[in-house]
Amino acid sequence: MTIDLSKRSYQKELLDRDDIPFGDIRRNMFELDVINTWLGGHAISISGLRRLLSGRKDVRICEIGCGGGDNLRALVRWCHKKHIRIHVTGIDHNVHCIEVAKERWKDGEAQWIHSDYRHVTFGREKPDIIFSSLFCHHFTDEELVFQLRWMEANAGAGWFINDLHRHYLAYQSIRWLTKWFSGSYLVKNDAPLSVLRGFTRGEWQELLRLAGIDGSRIQWKWAFRWLISKSFLVE
């Protein structure tokens, strides 16, 4: 089978449908947490957070597309080890994901918002840091330009994005890993497709240019991830 990696795929993932039974979504979220733990996805988000902290010991952080809250949990536990006080907000348009996040949260106070992130306003209580993880590849380029501008306008200290590098080795590796080790039909279908919906460095550079954003940093991270970040503080 020939795979075209020259441009992003816009084929919809199963998880983007509205008729998926929630038990299947729950299984999908559990496996994604395992994948992020073992393949370094959470470590990349921690790296993004560390860059933007700039020595502060009290931080407000918001994740858009938070799912079941696994990424926020990883960041909170890291902050606790570093004696950093962290206030978290998770936003997701899927009410079932918000319910799971609330159910599984054991790490102190958190605010969970069931909404499309585009409809959320913070007023004077802006989060210091806004981030997303494996969220951007669900959107078109036009939608991502809006998303970048939204993050730029609503974060107080900066923002970061953790998402997939579209690469042949990444595609084949996740296809075989999920074929043999996943029990979720959603993960088996969506994980390889997610890579095809991922990005190259040049595409991120163009998206940032279209959004009118200067001073951001694009870093390649193992395993086949991009960490895009912008600090509003002088470095």
Segments (PLM) and residue ranges:
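Class I SAM-dependent methyltransferase SAM/SAH-binding core
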Residues: 62, 68-71, 75-119
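Conserved beta-strand signature within the Rossmann-like core of class I S-adenosyl-L-methionine
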Residues: 156-164
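A conserved beta-strand element that flanks and buttresses the S-adenosyl-L-methionine
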Residues: 131
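Conserved S-adenosyl-L-methionine
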Residues: 215-224
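C-terminal alpha-helical "lid/dimerization" subdomain adjacent to the S-adenosyl-L-methionine
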Residues: 164-211, 217
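Class I SAM-dependent methyltransferase Rossmann-like catalytic core
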Residues: 22-48, 52
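A short, conserved alpha-helix within the catalytic core of class I
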Residues: 139-151
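N-terminal, positively charged/glycine-rich alpha-helical extensions of SAM-dependent methyltransferases
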Residues: 1-30
